[in-house]
Amino acid sequence: VIEDCNGSEILLEAHSLITGARQAQYAHPLEDYTQARDIFEGMTGVSLTVEQAVMFMVAVKLSRLRTAIADGGWHHDSIVDTAGYIGCLSMVHHAKER
């Protein structure tokens, strides 16, 4: 965990996660979140777009961050993950344009 991070360091950390380790582990976000969306629909009967599935994860991270800040804290991982999910959203958008 980087204690004294500026915004660019957060974004670089998020970028390295979504284009490196996590993408290698989970596949491209379009494929990964298409599968997650399909599982969610099977469980709940609620249809989401792939973009909405990614945005749901952004909402989860923002909720955790809001709780941490309300408690006087700061949750580095939630900041990085939120930036990463926004990056995933962009990757999904561009992959669908092709």
Placement of each model-derived feature along the sequence:
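Intrinsically disordered, low-complexity regulatory regions
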Residues: V1-R98
